[in-house]
Amino acid sequence: EYLRNLKNINLSDEDFNKIFLKKKKIALFALHYEPEAATNILGKNFNDQVLAIETLSKLLNDEWLILVKEHKDPPQSYKFRGNLFFERLKKIDNLYFINKDYKLTEIIEKADLISTITGTAGWEAINLGKKCLVFGNAWYQEIYGCTKYNDELTYDKFSKELNIPFDNQKFKES
């Protein structure tokens, strides 16, 4: 079932390369293993990863595309990503599901925003000079370059923050 769903939703390599030619901003959402403490405990209200992705889609406007990347080695995730998981993702118009074999750092370097619940993808992003948005209680959420989602966060408020160039000095001092 998992493999069939992947086949139906995965973006082809050719289409993946075309995404970066579009005149849209790219937000990467890196999926977690399931089950995992990073989502089940630290994710708080966002222990449902699709809910976090749906919230991200509502937060960003139509200038954005969302790339959802499967964890590179989901040993048991296939048991927890059933039909409903993929059906909900398919309902998000600006979303593309990408192959787990793409290197995360290469996508981070091309993306405008990295989003995760609490994962190391956010930490990797700010270390590479990219802004990140976390939905759970990530250990790095107070560090410069990272924004923690809350219900009061609006696109206008968030876009102002995103438009400020990343300041490596502030990151090093935080």
Regions found by a protein language model. Name each.
Residues E34, D73, A121, W139-Y140, ...:
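Short, glycine-/Ser/Thr-/acidic-enriched flexible segments
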Residues G145-S174:
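Leloir-type glycosyltransferase catalytic cores
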Residues G82-I98:
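Nucleotide-activated donor-binding/catalytic signature segment of Leloir-type glycosyltransferases, i.e.
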Residues L21, K90, I108-E109:
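A short, aliphatic-rich alpha-helical micro-motif
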Residues E1-N83:
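Conserved catalytic-core segment of nucleotide-activated headgroup transferases in glycan assembly
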Residues K100-T147:
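A donor-sugar binding/catalytic signature common to diverse glycosyltransferases
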